[in-house]
Amino acid sequence: MPRYPYRELKPTPEGEATYTRWITHLDTEFTRHHKPELRSEIVRDELHQLYLGRPHGGKLNFNMVTELPFNVLQLSLDPRNATLEPEYYGDLNPEKYAPLKPLIWFWQMFDRSPVGLNHWLGFRFRAMLGRHIFKHIGKNVKIFHGVEFSYGYNLTIEDNCTIHK
C-alpha cells in the first residue's frame, strides 16, 4: 500500500500571523507563570474571549434566576470551578498536576470550541501546550482534535509523531 505524506495547508497570511501571535502570547504567559492560580486566570480569560467574545470582567448577577445559566457558563470557563477525571484517581501526584490542570482544561475546552476545529491552529496550539504539560514533546508533532490524556506530566512524545483520536 502506498504511503501518502500529509499535504501542507496554510490559512491566509493574516490568519497565520494572528494565530501565531496568539500562540506566542500564550506560550510566553505560561512560561512566565507556573502557579496554578495565575494559569487558571489566564485560561479563564482566554476561554471567556473564545466562547463569549468579550473580556472577562464585571460582577455576576446572582439575584435573577434568568441569569443563572449564563452565570453557570461563565463560572465553568474557570478551571478552578471544574473537576477533571484524573483528580479522582489515587495515583495522581497533586504537586505535579496542580500547575498542569488549567492547561489540560484549556486543551479540552479549546477542542470543544469552534476554533478547535481548525487543524492548522490546533496542531500548533496543542504542541505549545504540550511543551508545558508533557515530560517531553519533540519537534514537528501533530496532535489532532479530540485527543485527551489524564496527567500529561509523565508523557514523552518524540519528534515527527502524529497522534489521532
Name each region found by the language model.
Residues M1-H132:
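Terminal amphipathic alpha-helical/low-complexity segments used for targeting or macromolecular assembly
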